Design a protein with these regions (language model features):
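Canonical positions in the second alpha-helix
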Residues: 21-22, 55-56, 90
Length: 115
């Protein structure tokens, strides 16, 4: 699936609109849901980002990148205990999927938060 290129001052809103339209057509599109969560997170709208990450992970419990990025968003939102829990769940998911790279990245982040 290819997304249209957005240009100009309204890039953020254009990307939000495009991803929202994709989700209207297919609410189970994990890639679009992840993208929407990331757009909100990058814009500093942590509440919306975390809502989208929650929807993503509820529908796709082994979408490993979702855990890591949700945890990063929780850290940015000054919610470290929730970030730790998210990382623990993400590590378990990465282990189920055999994704040792993501597992080690999340473990490093967990260790950093724990200190």
């Amino acid at each position: 699936m290819q997304f249209p290129r957005c240009s100009g001052k309204n890039n953020y809103m254009d990307r939000i609109a495009t991803l929202s339209e994709l989700l209207t057509q297919d609410p189970n599109n994990a890639f679009a849901r992840y993208g929407l969560a990331m757009e909100h997170s990058n814009a500093g709208d942590f509440a919306r980002a975390l809502d989208e990450f929650g929807k993503l992970l509820a529908a796709n419990p082994d979408y490993v990148p979702g855990y890591q990025m949700a945890a990063q968003t929780l850290v940015k939102a000054a919610r470290p205990s929730e970030a730790k829990s998210m990382l623990e769940n993400g590590i378990a998911s990465a282990q189920r999927k055999g994704d040792s790279h993501a597992e080690s990245e999340m473990q490093a982040m967990l260790d950093e938060i724990g200190s």
